[in-house]
Amino acid sequence: KIDSVSFPDSLKKIKRHAFEDCEYLKDIDFGNGIEVIGLHKSRIYDSSVFNGCSSLKHVTFPKQIKEIGRMAFKDSGLEKVELNEGLKLIGEAAFAYCKIKALRIPASVYDVDYMAFAGVDYVVFENESMTTSAAFALITEQIGTVHVTAGNKSIYIMSPTMKECLDGSVRTMDDMKRFAEEKAITMAEFLIKKDDSNGFKKMLEINDYCYDTLKSILDNIQIDNAVCMAYLMDEIEKKREAEDEFSM
């Protein structure tokens, strides 16, 4: 039973399937030599270096790590991940379907692959130019929501709709915010059916919808949840007052 592993400074790369399904593994010390964890761009082979390590809860990547390969930590027990400044590439499904609530992507990262963060609740991209990669990385077939921040802009959106951002029309966070406006009714319906008043409030606050979008939600959805209705009416009133003030 392997419950911890330490890598010597002389080792530069961890190869495919090295610790796949090591269910007792809890601690990893990458040392000062490891730069590459598995394969990044291969469409033929997955890396699965720590795939399925269900007891692994927390990983801190040291400063020399440059690449995290395809499916490297997929389906592991990870709850907290600290990515290093200097990291450049994150492969397909690298952290997909873990238990990570929030993840910060350093500005040094310039390439993030398909479904890399599928299932993560909140992702912060320090590099705002990573918007297209953000959509690509957050695609998932699981029905859920995701909060994305890039630079000083944020959106809150349904994860499966991210694939619709890949037609070339979404290149900036402003484009993504417009996309969030277009999907407002779909997302509002989803949250109301779940009876998720906190999620509904979060959607309204983060996406900061315009008056017309808020009115469209009111006119097109049956809202039986009194709390959600109160949140919506409050936002509509705020936008109405702001528009009245602007027109004076």
Q: Could you tell me what each predicted segment is?
A:
Residues 241-242:
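Terminal, non-catalytic domain-edge segments
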Residues 191, 220-221:
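Ankyrin-repeat helical register
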